């Protein structure tokens, strides 16, 4: 956080538990929505106490990080809950394993259609940033979706 504070640059607060080796074992939640939101609230509060500017905070609910398929889908269905945090929201679901589970597709490069569906959903919820692999396809679908949702 010293770098963020020193250079006054934007950064992403991402919800996750553990690390890449053990995060899948840490996916037990009483209520994934309230647990993730509460965790993000605490992370934001801690960063603000370190004199980090509010305008530099971007929030990511951490799709795929210490969450199973049902948790990821529950978060996607309730993106409006995270918009209520009043910070820009980033969703990074591109080619994630849960998309592969839904599509029965093991090859991540063959999951772009699922990513496109999520990008459309993000447009509907006015999500600020989507992290994607196939930029051209997502740009095109978001251009159409934005015209539909924003007139």
Where in the sequence are the language-model features?
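Phosphate/pyrophosphate-binding loops at sites that engage ATP/ADP/AMP, CoA/4′-phosphopantetheine
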Residues: 41-56
């Amino acid at each position: 956080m010293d770098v963020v504070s020193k250079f006054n640059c934007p950064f992403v607060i991402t919800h996750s538990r553990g690390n890449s080796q053990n995060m899948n074992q840490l996916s037990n939640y009483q209520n994934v929505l309230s647990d993730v939101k509460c965790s993000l609230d605490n992370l934001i509060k801690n960063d603000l106490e370190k004199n980090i500017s509010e305008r530099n905070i971007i929030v990511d609910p951490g799709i795929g990080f210490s969450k199973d398929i049902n948790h990821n889908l529950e978060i996607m269905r309730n993106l409006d809950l995270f918009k209520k945090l009043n910070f820009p929201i980033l969703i990074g679901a591109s080619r994630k394993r849960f998309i592969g589970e839904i599509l029965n597709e093991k090859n991540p490069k063959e999951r772009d259609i699922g990513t496109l569906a999520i990008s459309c959903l993000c447009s509907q919820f006015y999500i600020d940033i989507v992290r994607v692999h196939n930029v051209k396809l997502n740009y095109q679908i978001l251009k159409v979706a934005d015209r539909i949702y924003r007139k």
